[in-house]
């Protein structure tokens, strides 16, 4: 995934999903001996190991293949499905360019490392645009009424303007966690620009 805010969003989404599905849990696992942080999704007798890799910049995309090979497939001899979470930087949903150049190299590396499946979670918007699908919830968190218009071209600028309107500052990454935890993820699933049902289907729960 592209950045730390995406990691906060997806981990919060999985916690929400577990909370709203009986018999499911999503918990952080700390392995202090090797400095590894992972997560585990449990549903009945089934457990799924979840690991996040934050790329940071597009130029680091190809390094994700080596990360997957070394920290996932070689270390844990289990079937792995890889979800590529990214912004298309385009108003349409054409993802053909994400099968070319560095992205093709990444996909080849993942296949070489025996990824069972590669799933695209592509959004024609940045992560703040996705979160702003629940603008009512964000405004409630900020203690303000919903504005008639949001200033800014992209989601990040809009989010910053929304926070400034009440004298607050929007911070990305872990500092956004308190706000993200309050989001209406059902609304985002239903109306958002990312097909989160792909993730739900993979961990074998029925979205409500």
Model-identified regions with their sequence ranges:
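C-terminal accessory helical subdomains adjacent to catalytic cores in phosphodiester-
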Residues: 7-208
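Short hydrophobic beta-strand that contains or immediately precedes a catalytic carboxylate
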Residues: 1-2
């Amino acid at each position: 995934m592209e950045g730390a805010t995406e990691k906060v969003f997806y981990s919060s989404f999985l916690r929400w999903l577990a909370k709203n599905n009986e018999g499911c849990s999503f918990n952080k696992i700390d392995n202090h001996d090797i400095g590894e942080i992972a997560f585990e999704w449990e549903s009945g007798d089934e457990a799924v190991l979840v690991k996040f890799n934050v790329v940071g910049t597009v130029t680091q995309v190809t390094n994700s293949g080596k990360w997957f090979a070394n920290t996932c497939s070689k270390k844990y001899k289990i079937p792995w499905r890889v979800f590529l979470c990214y912004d298309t930087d385009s108003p349409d949903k054409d993802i053909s360019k994400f099968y070319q150049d560095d992205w093709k190299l990444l996909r080849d590396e993942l296949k070489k490392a025996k990824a069972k499946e590669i799933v695209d979670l592509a959004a024609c918007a940045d992560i703040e645009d996705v979160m702003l699908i629940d603008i009512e919830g964000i405004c409630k968190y900020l203690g303000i009424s919903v504005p008639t218009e949001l200033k800014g071209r992209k989601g990040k600028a809009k989010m910053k303007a929304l926070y400034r309107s009440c004298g607050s500052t929007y911070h990305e990454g872990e500092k956004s966690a308190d706000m993200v935890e309050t989001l209406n993820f059902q609304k985002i699933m239903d109306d958002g620009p990312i097909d989160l049902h792909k993730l739900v289907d993979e961990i074998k729960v029925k979205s409500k």
